[in-house]
Regions:
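Glycine-rich phosphate- or other oxyanion-binding loops that anchor nucleotides, phosphorylated ligands
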Residues: 1-136
């Protein structure tokens, strides 16, 4: 469903690592969500920092325009709201071991607009406190 729609929409290159979906625990998502302070979305976990996240260093991208296609992707009201490198592995391992897991991220940069927060540390501290309060 989501996975196949994402692969089709993004015109995923068969030679690239195949995307897969790891679901967060719905109960944790509900506990962490607050309409005023958070956004529900999809965290995309990339296999690398540069090319896999659409950053050009010295080599051309294997999938030019991938970030535009990811940005335009929608599935049953969900969209990709974050790009990082760890969540799928951690959540997948938790699921395999019978633990509950969810991801809550601080968005510190907007690649599309080229904006980034210079001082995100105070916001990270607020997010940590917010998360601990929601889970306790």
């Amino acid at each position: 469903p989501f996975e196949e729609a994402f692969i089709r929409h993004c015109r995923w290159t068969p030679s690239a690592a195949r995307p897969y979906v790891v679901n967060a625990d719905p109960g944790l998502v509900d506990r962490l969500y607050d309409e005023e302070h958070t956004i529900k979305g999809v965290t995309l976990t990339a296999v690398g920092f540069y090319g896999p996240q659409g950053r050009v260093l010295r080599l051309p991208l294997a999938m030019p325009g991938i970030n535009d296609r990811i940005t335009a992707f929608r599935y049953e009201g969900y969209k990709v709201t974050n790009y990082e490198m760890e969540s799928a592995a951690i959540t997948g391992l938790c699921n395999l071991l019978g633990h509950r897991a969810a991801t809550i991220c601080l968005i510190i940069a907007n690649r599309i607009n080229g904006d980034a927060s210079a001082d995100y540390h105070s916001y990270m501290n607020k997010l940590i406190r917010y998360t601990l309060e929601k889970l306790s």
